[in-house]
UniProtKB/Swiss-Prot annotation:
Cofactor(s) listed in the protein's UniProt record: Mg(2+)
GO terms under biological process: thiamine biosynthetic process; thiamine diphosphate biosynthetic process
Keyword Metal-binding: yes
UniProt organism field: Listeria innocua serovar 6a (strain ATCC BAA-680 / CLIP 11262)
Biological function: Condenses 4-methyl-5-(beta-hydroxyethyl)thiazole monophosphate (THZ-P) and 2-methyl-4-amino-5-hydroxymethyl pyrimidine pyrophosphate (HMP-PP) to form thiamine monophosphate (TMP).
InterPro entries membership: Aldolase_TIM, ThiamineP_synth_sf, ThiamineP_synth_TenI, TMP_synthase
Name listed for the protein in its UniProt record: Thiamine-phosphate synthase
Family, as annotated: Belongs to the thiamine-phosphate synthase family.
EC number: 2.5.1.3
Cofactor binding note of this UniProt entry: Binds 1 Mg(2+) ion per subunit.
Length: 214
């Protein structure tokens, strides 16, 4: 799981500023993302279940083509219906114990955490496969984001002895990803670093190899 978190792309139709979600996703897949989470939320998101399912299936097929895990955000029913590789939920989304009861053994389970105590609880649950920690830096992609924690939260979680794979979340881009990895994350998740980039390939190359020239 740790290797799959290296460059974890998150997006929904609301994040796309040019082209379409499938076209941006395929470009990112070609460039080397290691995981994709379909997150359809907020202003500009698809509103009907049928639209979301149709888009999810198109993105899932692209991920399968490039052998990259396809994860759905906060929609257990859809994830189970289409056989997603994983489900990711936040602290205020579907109750994590219900998610575990429905999904454990069928797909990977990811949980967002914002503190050491939440990370410890995720590890105690036993069926959480990885945690998303953040927001590390200020983000424009999530209107209801928690307060920024900085990279210190990653160091604190690792000092607490938590062994779960960690992907950093929030405001991460090719210029600051190395800080996130140095602080203890196994990978970085990005939205706007890819969706708003005019050179997706260069951005992903730098995310995969922090410090490398573009």
């Amino acid at each position: 799981m740790r290797a799959e978190l290296a460059v974890y792309f998150i997006a929904g139709t609301q994040d796309i500023v040019r082209g379409t979600l499938p076209s941006v996703l395929e470009e990112a897949l070609k460039a080397g993302i290691t995981c994709f989470q379909y997150r359809e939320k907020g202003a500009g998101a698809l509103q009907t279940a049928s639209e979301r399912k149709e888009m999810a299936l198109e993105c899932q097929q692209l991920c399968a083509k490039y052998q990259v895990p396809f994860i759905i955000n906060d929609d257990v029913a859809l994830a189970l219906e289409i056989g997603a590789d994983g489900i990711h939920v936040g602290q205020n989304d579907e109750e994590i114990r219900q998610v575990i009861a429905s999904c454990a053994g069928k797909m990977k389970i990811g949980l967002s955490v914002h503190s050491v105590s939440e990370a410890e609880e995720a590890e105690r649950l036993g069926s959480v496969d990885y945690i998303g920690v953040g927001p590390i830096f200020p983000t424009i992609s999530k209107a209801d984001a928690e307060p920024v924690s900085g990279t210190a939260i990653l160091e604190e979680i690792r000092r607490a002895g938590i062994k779960l794979p960690i992907v950093g979340i929030g405001g991460i881009n090719e210029t600051n990803s190395a800080e996130v990895l140095t602080a203890g994350a196994d990978g970085v998740s990005v939205i706007s670093a890819i969706t708003r980039s005019e050179d997706c390939q260069s951005v992903i190359k730098q995310l995969k190899n922090p410090g490398s020239p573009s």
